[in-house]
Amino acid sequence: MKQYLDLLDRVLTEGIEKGDRTGTGTISVFGHQMRFNLDEGFPCLTTKKLHLKSIIYELLWFLKGDTNVKYLQDHGVRIWNEWADETGDLGHIYGYQWRSWPTYDGGFIDQISEAVDAIKHNPDSRRIIVSAWNVGDLDHMNLPPCHAFFQFYVANGRLSLQLYQRSADIFLGVPFNIASYALLLQMMAQVTGLQAGDFIHTLGDAHIYLNHLEQVKLQLSREPRPLPQMKINPDVKNIFDFQFEDFELVNYDPHPHIAGKVAV
């Protein structure tokens, strides 16, 4: 994906070296945008192999409103283990905010259900937004949300999604985020009777950790390959009814995986 490789190249060329919360050190730029037209293929990185199983199960976990790693671990996914407490809980992170945003009167807002309803019945609304950045709840999250909020846009029978990501680990995290939100867009388009349009990924602090520089250079040396296609079970009409078996990535021919250590 040229958009992603251009981002890597920009950060290597223009990035400023900065300290960070983890003590690892980064080079970063502030403000970057990538656009992916899903008509051109599913944006799953080809210059290194991604673990699609983790991406799908994590998204289903978010949509369940779950915040305990047991569901992920039961399906062989370990990407959240480092931030979980001794009971496996992560606090009021993504799934909680997406499905159970607390209100002042003691109630809860299911933002995903409201987004589906708005897309179907008020598609011209400029308020079709789902936010995980709940300022009053940040102290109850083991890790504040990096991909903070996203907005839907309906035009000419197509549904598009724009994500704002405040903190973007470009080598490890961003490829997962691209694939995850592109998949969410396809799922939301299907259940609302629309075609999937563009996924727009807007980044705030876009950084490469200093211990990932050699991996990034290796990735930039590889020639991108044609994008795969994501096939989704057409019989699923409710956003909360999707199962892992409803997804099939076809014609995915990536370069080999490149390992990198997660900064915790």
UniProtKB/Swiss-Prot annotation:
Pathways per UniProt: Pyrimidine metabolism; dTTP biosynthesis
The keyword Methyltransferase is annotated on this UniProt entry: yes
Active site: 146
EC identifiers of the protein: 2.1.1.45
Main location: cytoplasm
One annotated Gene Ontology cellular component of this protein: cytosol
Reaction(s) this enzyme catalyzes, per UniProt: dUMP + (6R)-5,10-methylene-5,6,7,8-tetrahydrofolate = 7,8-dihydrofolate + dTMP
UniProt xrefs under SUPFAM superfamilies: Thymidylate synthase/dCMP hydroxymethylase
Leading EC class: transferase
Binding-site list for dUMP: 21, 126-127, 166-169, 177, 207-209
Its biological purpose: Catalyzes the reductive methylation of 2'-deoxyuridine-5'-monophosphate (dUMP) to 2'-deoxythymidine-5'-monophosphate (dTMP) while utilizing 5,10-methylenetetrahydrofolate (mTHF) as the methyl donor and reductant in the reaction, yielding dihydrofolate (DHF) as a by-product. This enzymatic reaction provides an intracellular de novo source of dTMP, an essential precursor for DNA biosynthesis.
Quaternary structure annotation from Swiss-Prot or TrEMBL: Homodimer.
NCBIfam families per record: PRK01827.1-3 (NF002497), PRK01827.1-5 (NF002499), thym_sym (TIGR03284)
Record-given protein name: Thymidylate synthase
Annotated organism of origin: Bacteroides fragilis (strain ATCC 25285 / DSM 2151 / CCUG 4856 / JCM 11019 / LMG 10263 / NCTC 9343 / Onslow / VPI 2553 / EN-2)
